[in-house]
Every structure is written in C-alpha cells, then in structure tokens.
Amino acid sequence: MSRGLELLIAQTILQGFDAQYGRFLEVTSGAQQRFEHADWHAVQQAMKQRIHLYDHHVGLVVEQLRCITEGKSTDVDFLLRVKEHYTHLLPDYPRFEIAESFFNSVYCRLFDHRSLSPERLFIFSSQPARRFRAIPRPLAKDFFPEKGWEKALNNVLSDLPLRLPWQNKTRDVGYISAHLVETLGEETLRHSHLQVANELFFRNKAAWLVGKLITPDATLPFLLPIHRSDDGELFVDTCLTTSAEASIVFGFARSYFMVYAPFPAALVEWLREILPVKTTAELYMAIGCQKHAKTESYREYLYYITSTDEQFIEAPGIRGMVMLVFTLPGFDRVFKVIKDQFAPQKEMTAAHVRACYQLVKEHDRVGRMADTQEFENFVLDKRQIDPTLMALLLQEAPDKITDLGDKIAISHLYIERRMVPLNIWLEQVEGAQLRDAIEEYGNAIRQLAAANIFPGDMLFKNFGVTRHGRVVFYDYDEICYMTEVNFRTIPAARYPEDELASEPWYSVSPGDVFPEEFRHWLCADPRIGPLFEEMHDDLFRADYWRSLQTRIKEGHVEDVYAYRKRQRFCLRG
C-alpha cells in the first residue's frame, strides 16, 4: 500500500473523532433547554443518545477505512506507521487524550480486539506530561464577598445563564449564607471567596452549580443543586460543602453529567481539587466521557498490577450462579466473567445477561447501580492468578479462556467498583450502623423502582456498601423494567393444608412477583426483621408496587437527590 495511505487513514480517524465529539457537545448543549422546559423524558433520551454516539461514529470510521483500504490486509509495519502519523496530529489538538481512546476503539473494532499492544495502541498516553493545552477562556469565575456574602451569593445566582424566574432568590441566598456561617464560621468566611464553573452540570431534574469555596486553610467543594418548580420557577435545594458530599454527587453509581466541556482535560483537572479521592477515570466518567474513562481505568489497573506481587483471588461473598467474580486484595475493583453454564434455576442466556448490563449503562442509575466497563480479550499473567481461582476459571468459564503460554486471555469481562457485600456488612455491624444499612437498602429499592427498575433478585448478597455507607445494587442478571412485572397478592388459602403443601395452591405465570414473599428472606434474621418491618413494610405489599407502576405509566419522573432529604432547605427547621 502507498505510504500516503497511512496519513489519510490517520486523518480519517481524527476527523471521525471530531464528528463524534461535535455531536457529543451538540447533545450536551441541549441540556439547559430540556431543564427549562421540564422535558424529563427528553433528558432520559438524550442520555441514551449521547452514550450511543461513540460506538456509532466508531462504526462509521471503520466502514470508511474498509473502503479506503479496499479490504486489503494490513501488515504490522503499516499499522505502526498509521499510529505514528496519528501521534503527529495530536500535539496541538485540544482533546488529544480522548482522540487517543477513539483511535484505540477504531483499531479494536477493525481487528476484533486482537493483537492489542502498546506499539499498536495508545495503551499509554503519547503526551503524559501534558494534561491539557492552554484554553481560550477561563473555566470558572471568581466571586469575592467585598460587600458581604449575601451580595456575593446574589451575584452568583444572578450570573447563571438560566432563563427562568426565581421562586425566591432572597430566601435561597439566606439559606446558603446561613449554611456557610454554620459550617465555617463568620471569621473564616471573611477571608474566603468563591470560584464557580462557567458551565452548569445537568443531571436528572437538576442543574448543578459547581464551584470551589476557597478559604485560608483549604479549598472546599461548593455545590448547589438548582431545581425547577412545577410553576417553572427556580430554587436552590441545598448547599454541599464537604468532600464526602461532593464525592457522592460525582459517584460511580450515578448517571453522567451533561456539562458542556470542549476541553474535557482542563475541566477534569479543575474538578480534581474538590474531588481529591476520585481517580482520573472517575472524573472523565462523571462528565460523560465514558470511553476515555475506560482507557484511564485500564491504565490505573496496569499501574497497580505492575507494582504489586498480589495474586488475583475469588472475590469475597457468596458465589454467584451466573457470574464468576475475582479481584486483587488491594485493588478497589472487581472483575466479573459470565459463566459458560448457569445454575438450573437461572433460565437465561449469556446474551440476556449482557443486555441487562447494557440496560444499566444506558438507564438512569439514580445513585443505586454501579457503572461497569466492558473488556474483550483481557490478558492476565498466570503467575498472578491464585491456583484456586485458575481452577475455578477453567471449570466455570473454559470457553472464555485462551491459553497464551505464560498468560491467559479472557474473551469477555466487566470491571466494576468493589464494595463490601451487604450480607457481609450486615453480619459485621450493630446498632446505628445496622439501622442505617437497612434504611439505605430500602431506600435503594424504592429509588430503583421509582426509576422503572425492578432488581429481580433482592437478596442482600446482590447489593454492596460503598465507602460512604451507601447501598448500591450490582447483580444485574434478573433486572427488568418495573412495567414488565405483574405484582400480585398471594390468594387466601382454600384449606389449612394448602399452606403446608410443597407446591403453591395458586397459579404462577412468568413475570408474576409476590411481594409478600420478600419477607421470608429479608426478615429471617431477628436483628433485621423488626427494623425492616418498621421502615419498609410497604415493600411487602403488592399495592405499593402497583401504585409505582401507575405513576411510571402516567409519565411521572421522580426527583433524585444525591444527598439525604433532611439536607434539603425546604425540610430544615
């Protein structure tokens, strides 16, 4: 092939990425209008559309390249020259880091995720020292309380691009000011100021103002969720100023923000100061660059695996009937492989399981479902696999394992944040911690249901506890939409003997769910049963679930709060 062809291919890939990110920004830029018009269903559709854009544009580029090369095979030297030309296009490119990930995706689509090596792919960044280039305008604006904090806060709210009237701006400014005084004290505030991002962060039914509260001693988060009333008026729902609160808002179990970010690396770097525990991958994920977040996540994994002598082991917890889960003892993620054969009671296919995971990726996760990254032909060094785990992999998923000599390749797996399984957590805690966990579990079920998600298998083992004590669902093989379920009350027994029979005295059809049965496995522990009955007894009634279904079918979209309801200004004393 002509040497000029390599440059043409490199340019075609970069132009394809330009087109993809342009559409990404176009969809994102509509977030403000969707919020102002309260078009919540359009919010959900835009979220799915934006996720699909990436793979769609990768596919378009792949088809272009097949036409350009006329289907001829390409040798290794040719591919290396394509990457070299592509690398030379990036030094002055404003989104070079995501462009590298796009190149990787095109390569993997062309070559079916095979022959993946640092020479052919951007497994490591071509410009590791350059996080981002100079940008044409600042990301944020400073506000100083020269005439008092209430005046400064009024200026912050007045400066927003939102075109709706305020319900009561003076009231909200008073709430925020009082919260800052209560949290930091007047003396500290006298020597502090705000730096507020120019772009709002939209998600669900809220527009988030994201800023930094810069004090003499520290830089703190300054987050204001702005909501729209049914009358079309704006109000601030709360003010969050701790790193823990900010971490939850930007958490891995939440949908991606819609924030206009033509220079994503610069925004990630700006956010890092108020989200110090978040990795680079998590920050890119939060702003919707999920494919590049996958690249960064893999780099974080490579950094860890090359600096430890730990071995992969089976993950703690009850072994699943569908997934084989393993981890590294000191790593904060788990690796999930779909088994070749499922337990008899799991009447489903691997394709169904993958569809469930994709549903979660595209759906509003409401802070209650863990995000995942999907990998193909994932290579592990045999020396770093515990023999017991190796035997288990070969027993449960032999069709997915390829022996490469001193390594193995797993044809398909998911990587997910590691949490403490809820069943283990409940065994270890007492008192207030136990009560909080049961309250959190019930809240998770309610919020998932309100978002039109029924977990299917509600056993404690299918949920995890995060470092912030939040309960998150992570076992998706039986997940379905609430509207697909037939919630029924168990009919009264005809005779006393019916209740002692091994088979039910009533008919059961596919899709039937009897909430009364939840009590048998959720309340069996005498420490847990009374707490569950006190806080969540309505979960055992079919009419509760049917009422949620009615609201969903009527088009109602529930509010989702990334903080405790007691923190809302409208509920404070």
Curated annotation (Swiss-Prot):
EC number in record: 2.7.11.5, 3.1.3.-
Gene Ontology MF annotations: [isocitrate dehydrogenase (NADP+)] kinase activity; AMP binding; ATP binding; phosphoprotein phosphatase activity; protein serine/threonine kinase activity
Lineage: superkingdom: Bacteria
GO cellular component: cytoplasm
Record: active site: 371
Any Gene Ontology biological process: glyoxylate cycle
Binding site for ATP: 315-321, 336
UniProt subcellular location: Cytoplasm
Keywords: ATP-binding, Cytoplasm, Glyoxylate bypass, Hydrolase, Kinase, Nucleotide-binding, Protein phosphatase, Serine/threonine-protein kinase, Transferase, Tricarboxylic acid cycle
Catalysed reaction equations from the record: L-seryl-[isocitrate dehydrogenase] + ATP = O-phospho-L-seryl-[isocitrate dehydrogenase] + ADP + H(+)
Main location: cytoplasm
Family from the record: Belongs to the AceK family.
Record NCBIfam families: PRK02946.1
Purpose of the protein: Bifunctional enzyme which can phosphorylate or dephosphorylate isocitrate dehydrogenase (IDH) on a specific serine residue. This is a regulatory mechanism which enables bacteria to bypass the Krebs cycle via the glyoxylate shunt in response to the source of carbon. When bacteria are grown on glucose, IDH is fully active and unphosphorylated, but when grown on acetate or ethanol, the activity of IDH declines drastically concomitant with its phosphorylation.
Protein name in the entry: Isocitrate dehydrogenase kinase/phosphatase
Organism: Enterobacter sp. (strain 638)
Lineage: Bacteria, Pseudomonadati, Pseudomonadota, Gammaproteobacteria, Enterobacterales
